[in-house]
Amino acid sequence: NPCLTFVTPTLLAGDRSQAHVVAHEIAHSWSGNLVTNLTWEHFWLNEGFTVFIERKIMHQLYGKSVFDFNAIGGLMELKETVDRLGATHPHTVLMPALEGGVDPDDVFSKVPYEKGFVFLVYLEHMASGRSDADADAANGTEAFAAFLKAHFERSKFGCVTSEGFRASYAEAFPEANEKVDWDTWLTAPGMPP
């Protein structure tokens, strides 16, 4: 079963302090297990999506303030990683180049998790067609959720790339896609634009 998740009983604490970890592992049922990245350059498609879904689950369970708190905490972790590596370090890009024998373990950091999450929040905002900061209103969120559901259904039991995801987004949200600087998001080092 590609969607089977094993969870140690220690994560099921009575105070629910580890609920985000359980939500993260459940989210991997879709991003990582049902659909996975073709190569390690596209690892953000596993972990960025998983963090995005995890935080959406937490939002449903505990409200927007928990979503915002976790998003801010993740952004702080991303900033710490970028500060530690350096704002121009090639391992701070969302889609790192791994040619020439670069070990994917050497690139492993918070970048695919948190920069990927921020990118997906941005894409969701752009899909809403709204210019204000409150784009998680029903229109954009529901349209993006439907898009992600279709993405996972179309790609199930397969592998995905950033280019393939970009093409799917462009097909679903052509006007929004025109405004997205994919190259900067995917290949520019440092913090998100």
Functional labels for PLM-detected ranges:
Residues N1-P193:
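Hydrophobic alpha-helical and helix-loop surface patches within well-folded domains
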